[in-house]
Amino acid sequence: MHQRALLFSALAVAANAQQVGTQTPETHPPLTWQKCTAAGSCSQQSGSVVIDANWRWLHSTKDTTNCYTGNTWNTELCPDNESCAQNCALDGADYAGTYGVTTSGSELKLSFVTGANVGSRLYLMQDDETYQHFNLLNHEFTFDVDVSNLPCGLNGALYFVAMDADGGMSKYPSNKAGAKYGTGYCDSQCPRDLKFINGMANVEGWEPSSSDKNAGVGGHGSCCPEMDIWEANSISTAVTPHPCDDVSQTMCSGDACGGTYSESRYAGTCDPDGCDFNPFRMGNESFYGPGKIVDTKSKMTVVTQFITADGTDSGALSEIKRLYVQNGKVIANSVSNVAGVSGNSITSDFCTAQKKAFGDEDIFAKHGGLSGMGKALSEMVLIMSIWDDHHSSMMWLDSTYPTDADPSKPGVARGTCEHGAGDPENVESQHPDASVTFSNIKFGPIGSTYEG
């Protein structure tokens, strides 16, 4: 995900590290959600959302000079990582006007293209300075989503990562912006497109993208476990745990980061592939999509349960279960139709069998597998985003992938989208009005957040 260049008329306060500007007040859009104790017994929580720091206007602490424009840094203000952090400030956001982000009660709508801005990434806040932390173990997480306006190549994602609740302020005193300004992001790709990591800029080694006018790849990445509850559009969906060797955020260097942004995908300390359950990829082509069993033309409720071996909030993660509720009917997740792979939930046995059946390298097991994922689930931050994919055009989600593989081979077909349909150039020009709407977030013990 990438910051988009903004222009404001501003003066900023000077200080001595990753700074905060004063031109646009930072007002987090309110978003309510519910904490449940038993079925039908839920209490409303008053939260808010904050946009990631990577999208924000970054300018000189002394005036309105951009520190970053398009996909390049200002070399005078940012000759190195430390100087850049001292010289540059993040400013507040116009959520609706600049980023196409609006809230109403429990509803969050993310628009795809707004002016020059493409996509967004938002975090749920506990208060103005702190991300909301969740312990997913022995709990379920439920939300409503409308994906009807998400065509091929787009991803309206809801997921968790093991970010610091304060955005890294206490660990890295040079970070003066913190969670209030959306700092501290990490995930299992160890993303190197972040402009700041651990309170320092990522300008050293920065290479502007050849395909994305707003993004680039820096010398460092930010790694942490990632639980993808929902990566989806109107064609395909996947739920995917991604463990890492460390349960909290760490910084990596260069191609040793692995993941999407590096020469060697599996060189890092995280699992960039995960163990995914995509109904189409698992052989059921009539389960999810327009007019299918889970009909993406209508809003749906998505329930994800994190079962522990001993039924406690600190037990070992043993299973991730998915079900849906639509039009008052509970719909069990589709069952695998792949030879040698059984079940309709994510377990250690499922993941081992799936990797074998698809001929995929088992990086999931290498980095701890399901139990490793479970160790990170006690302190997770909720993320909601909309994005397109400059690396592989989202074909890993909704098309056949790898592109040169036999589509009849197990695991290659992931959805009905044609090659090229999801190219960012196409979706940004043909579907700028695409959007995703999340609402009615509920969290509580198993069985407490839905009826049916």
UniProtKB/Swiss-Prot annotation:
Q: Which GO terms describe its cellular component?
A: extracellular region
Q: Which chemical reaction does it catalyze?
A: Hydrolysis of (1->4)-beta-D-glucosidic linkages in cellulose and cellotetraose, releasing cellobiose from the non-reducing ends of the chains
This chain is glycosylated at N81, N284
Tell me where in or outside the cell this protein is found: Secreted
Keyword field contains GTP-binding:
no
Q: Which residues form the signal peptide?
A: 1-17
Biological-process GO terms, alphabetical? cellulose catabolic process; glucan catabolic process
Q: In which domain of life is the source organism classified?
A: Eukaryota
InterPro entries tied to this protein: ConA-like_dom_sf, Glyco_hydro_7, Glyco_hydro_7_sf
Region annotation Disordered: where it falls in the sequence: 405-431
- Which terms are listed as keywords in the entry? Carbohydrate metabolism, Cellulose degradation, Glycoprotein, Glycosidase, Hydrolase, Polysaccharide degradation, Secreted, Signal
Is the keyword Ribosomal protein in the record? no
Q: Where's the active site on this chain?
A: E226, E231
Under the GO molecular function aspect, what terms does this record hold?
cellulose 1,4-beta-cellobiosidase activity
Uppermost EC category? hydrolase
Q: What is its EC number?
A: 3.2.1.91
**What biological function has been recorded for the protein in this entry?**
The biological conversion of cellulose to glucose generally requires three types of hydrolytic enzymes: (1) Endoglucanases which cut internal beta-1,4-glucosidic bonds; (2) Exocellobiohydrolases that cut the disaccharide cellobiose from the non-reducing end of the cellulose polymer chain; (3) Beta-1,4-glucosidases which hydrolyze the cellobiose and other short cello-oligosaccharides to glucose.
Family as reported in the entry's similarity comment? Belongs to the glycosyl hydrolase 7 (cellulase C) family.
Q: What is this protein called?
A: Probable 1,4-beta-D-glucan cellobiohydrolase A
Organism from which the protein derives: Aspergillus fumigatus (strain ATCC MYA-4609 / CBS 101355 / FGSC A1100 / Af293) (Neosartorya fumigata)
